Amino acid sequence: MSQKFLFIDRDGTIIAEPPTDYQVDRLDKLALEPDVIPALLALQKADYKLVMITNQDGLGTSSFPQETFDPPHNLMMQILTSQGINFEQILICPHLPEDNCTCRKPKTALVESYLADGVMNSATSYVIGDRETDLQLAENMGISGLRYQRDGLNWTQIAKQLTQRDRHAYVNRVTKETAIDVNVWLDREGGSKIKTGVGFFDHMLDQIATHGGFRMDIQVSGDLYIDDHHTVEDTALALGEAINIALGDKRGIGRFGFVLPMDECLARCALDISGRPHLEYKAEFNYQRVGDLSTEMVEHFFRSLSYAMACTLHLKTKGRNDHHRVESLFKVFGRTLRQAIRVEGNTLPSSKGVL
């Protein structure tokens, strides 16, 4: 699998660039840009490999002797390394613009090895720098560029932009009985729009989204003139598939979740996003319907959902009121799902290496 890389400029991006001569040639000129260390640590944790690429005009000549460049550069590297920041390579072009070399940014000679097939994931790699030449380099490499600005797109914002996930999936399911559109955003909250034609079922699905801490839009056209069976079943299948797709490779998720009490009922839920579908369910109801939802379809919903989502799900509730018992199951599932889909790191939560 190709790797995601960050190609990062030095002067004006990692360290401050002196406005007078644009050369960091003394120790007293060395100053890190604000928040660069925590940002680079966060980016490393998100599995980015770091490459420093910098133009150093006339390095090694009388205008910029190597012996004046090395002390501040080496100190910068010592500071970064001491904080756990590791650069795969330090790429330096020492030439002047008039030298017409092939390695000066925005030309790509220094990064040719990364442009070979299968080395770099171009969709998830970036050039980060404070100059237009950095953005031109990104364009020449076929990747995206980010223009660093201390008072604009700063390191805190860059780290947030590149590490914050927006897990989304869309599923369209059409059968002879139903037509269903499901959108799921696991990293957004609020604003869910749900219309299945079964009012109480809409309310229950909203409980999953609200207590699960994510957003979903569900639009259903079903054969309700017969009953609610196909509408509930197919919605569960489409929703489970959408959640499963949105989870992606499941890297970094909590995977497990469990909750006990809910309302005056005692509702229990244990969840493992394991890739192995299974449902254990125990609930009894006094009546055949709650509102316009058949109570027998509650178990069928969760069974269909668990199989489409490829998860192991244990659900149980006790109580006196059917409305509360049904609602407790949807609420407790939502709260449990919130724990399981939360991103807690960047490793796959399985000793098998796959979920």
UniProtKB/Swiss-Prot annotation:
It comes from Yersinia pseudotuberculosis serotype I (strain IP32953). InterPro entries: HAD-like_sf, HAD-SF_hydro_IIIA, HAD_sf, His_synth_bifunc_HisB, HisB_N, Histidinol-phos, IGPD_sf, ImidazoleglycerolP_deHydtase. Residues 167-355 are annotated as: Imidazoleglycerol-phosphate dehydratase. Its main location: cytoplasm. GO terms for biological process: L-histidine biosynthetic process. In the N-terminal section; belongs to the histidinol-phosphatase family. In the C-terminal section; belongs to the imidazoleglycerol-phosphate dehydratase family. It comes from the Bacteria. It is found in: Cytoplasm. The active site is at 9 (nucleophile), 11 (proton donor). Residues 1-166 are annotated as: Histidinol-phosphatase. GO terms for cellular component: cytoplasm. Keywords: Amino-acid biosynthesis, Cytoplasm, Histidine biosynthesis, Hydrolase, Lyase, Magnesium, Metal-binding, Multifunctional enzyme, Zinc. Pfam families: Hydrolase_like, IGPD. Its cofactor is Mg(2+); Zn(2+). GO terms for molecular function: histidinol-phosphatase activity; imidazoleglycerol-phosphate dehydratase activity; metal ion binding. It catalyses: D-erythro-1-(imidazol-4-yl)glycerol 3-phosphate = 3-(imidazol-4-yl)-2-oxopropyl phosphate + H2O; L-histidinol phosphate + H2O = L-histidinol + phosphate. This is Histidine biosynthesis bifunctional protein HisB. SUPFAM superfamilies: HAD-like (SSF56784), Ribosomal protein S5 domain 2-like (SSF54211).
